[in-house]
Amino acid sequence: CGLFDEEYEDADGGEFNFELLTEHPFDCLNQELDVFVNVFGIYVISHSSIPTEYVEHSANVLAEFMDNDADGVMDDPEVHRFLVENNFVVPVWTKALREEVFPSLRGTFCEDNLGWAASMYYGNDDWAFGGIKQAGTWDTNLEEIWHVVSVGWYNTYPEYFGDRTGSRLADAMDAARGGHFLTVPNSYPEGAWYTYDDYTCDYSCQMHEYFYWILMANIDALDPAYTNKCADSEDEWYVCTKDELQQIDPLAYDLLNNQGFKLPTRIPSGSYRGLSGRETS
């Protein structure tokens, strides 16, 4: 089927299967990497030294973010189109492997024609196999893979989600921080509920983190009933549930729920169910 066909079905009309591939269509990625998963035209890229269950879990989380209701249709075709046309990739690797890959891309097509936003690091990041509700631990995939997917949202709907001053997302973040701070302030105003203090994180970077936090709260991924993530993050963000988001951050709640956008509403668990309702992991 074509890259932008509405539905993704295999020849039998069943679920979309995420096959582990040994080559990427861009040969420049094949020099140091040898495991790839095509998730609706967006590639998870990895290496055979990484256990396959980690790669497959990340691929399934990506699929769940793109088709959260698992009906086989991209939740937002324009966000999907942006990510595919700009060749975004989701690396699952180690820092040592990363240091081998990037030099191999210099002077090749891949150097300037791939989309990079975030990575999953085997041995450092956390995978919650079976999902956070079952595992009882946080899944770093929920953050890092959303950082990739969200680039499509920033660029497709700049008035609403643009990662710069003036968008609705920026206005909501300014309210959450207690003011418009282009750089991290020495201290946040009393009453602020988004208080990220990484001085290397500029305004757009602060927005990326904020978009992640409000989405996680909105899908109840931070609910203390599941993991300790919200309590562990209270020095940066303490809004744990959709109900709390509505009460504490009404601008974010309205943006996510009342403006007609089809954002994720279910917590990705690493088990994309596709068209048939069967898990692919």
Locations of regions flagged by a protein language model:
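Generic detection of long, well-ordered alpha-helical segments
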Residues: 48-56, 202, 242-246
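Acidic/His-rich structured neighborhood in mature extracellular/periplasmic domains
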Residues: 32, 39-185
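Pan-zinc metallopeptidase signature
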Residues: 211-281
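Post-HExxH zinc-binding segment in Zn-dependent metallohydrolases
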Residues: 153-227, 233-237
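Start-of-domain marker
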Residues: 17, 21-30, 39
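Intrinsically disordered, low-structural-confidence terminal and linker regions
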Residues: 1-17
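Sequence contexts marking disulfide-bonded cysteines in secreted/extracellular proteins
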Residues: 2, 27-29, 109-111, 231
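Short amphipathic alpha-helical surface micro-motifs
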Residues: 25-28, 70-74, 193-195
